[in-house]
């Protein structure tokens, strides 16, 4: 099984061909437009968002039955729970404080999504929690619930682990491979995209190279093979 998460920086339908060679089973896409479920020949496409051309998509191989969970809470901006046979997936594009522009009764915080979907994630022996968290320990201030260390701790309590950090043994905040380049500048790099897995062992995880992907997006894809 192959899993990808990638913030495509808009116009995903025109960029998908760049992912096709990976032959992935599960693809979590941030900043993508709303498309029909059967838009892609080999994957079903599920979407959530408040802006038609800029939401969160999850693609599942058509060989696997999948659906959006009945628990889907649209007041949690850009978090999408997908149920497949024997596997739960929570796609993430954390809007954080920016979600406030959609009203006072919504949240874009990963901490709130974790709290809401906690039992759903706990009930499944095999799960994926991944995407663009827009978060890193380098930005943590004080002891806020939505600090990345707090999020990581909550995920650890649910038996999730970041595959990148498990494989590389690198400390959070000291990652050698960035996933995001602010304003597409190579010297403004951060690691803010993650794949947390539960009940699965990964063979490897790769992050796209700046030179290969920067023309397409300010984020690099994470590709994990199970």
Please report, for each region that a protein language model flagged, where it lies by residue.
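N-terminal, active-site-proximal structural segment of metallo-dependent hydrolase catalytic domains
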Residues: 1-41, 50-56
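Active-site-proximal loop/helix segment associated with metal-binding centers of metalloenzymes
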Residues: 89-107, 153, 158
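Metal-dependent phosphoesterases centered on the DNase I-like endonuclease/exonuclease/phosphatase
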Residues: 26, 109-192
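Catalytic phosphate/metal-binding cores of nucleic-acid and nucleotide-processing enzymes, i.e., regions
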Residues: 10, 17, 22, 33-34, ...
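Conserved beta strand-loop-helix elements of the APE1-like EEP
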Residues: 51-67, 84, 175, 181-203, ...
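Active-site metal-binding loops of divalent metal-dependent hydrolases
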Residues: 8, 32, 94, 133, ...
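Structured beta-strand-rich core segments of catalytic domains in phosphoester-bond hydrolases
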Residues: 31-99
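Short catalytic/ligand-binding loop motif for oxyanion handling, primarily in non-cytosolic enzymes
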Residues: 12-14, 35-38, 97-100, 136-140, ...
């Amino acid at each position: 099984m192959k899993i990808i998460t990638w913030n495509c920086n808009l116009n995903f339908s025109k960029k998908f061909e760049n992912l096709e060679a990976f032959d992935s089973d599960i693809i979590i896409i941030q900043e993508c437009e709303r498309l029909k479920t059967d838009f892609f020949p080999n994957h079903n496409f599920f979407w959530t968002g408040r802006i038609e051309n800029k939401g969160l998509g999850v693609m599942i191989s058509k060989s696997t039955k999948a659906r959006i969970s009945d628990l889907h809470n649209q007041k949690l901006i850009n978090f999408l729970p997908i149920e497949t046979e024997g596997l739960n997936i929570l796609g993430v594009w954390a809007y954080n404080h920016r979600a406030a522009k959609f009203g006072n009764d919504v949240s874009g915080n990963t901490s709130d999504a974790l709290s809401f979907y906690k039992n759903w994630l706990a009930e499944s022996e095999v799960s994926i929690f991944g995407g663009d968290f827009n978060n890193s320990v380098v930005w943590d201030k004080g002891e806020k619930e939505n600090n990345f260390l707090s999020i990581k701790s909550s995920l650890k309590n649910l038996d999730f682990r970041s595959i990148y950090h498990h494989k590389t043994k690198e400390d959070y905040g000291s990652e050698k491979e960035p996933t995001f380049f602010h304003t597409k500048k190579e010297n403004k790099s951060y690691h803010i995209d993650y794949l947390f897995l539960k009940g699965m062992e990964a063979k490897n995880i790769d992050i796209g190279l700046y030179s290969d992907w920067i023309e397409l997006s300010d984020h690099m894809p994470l590709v994990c093979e199970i």
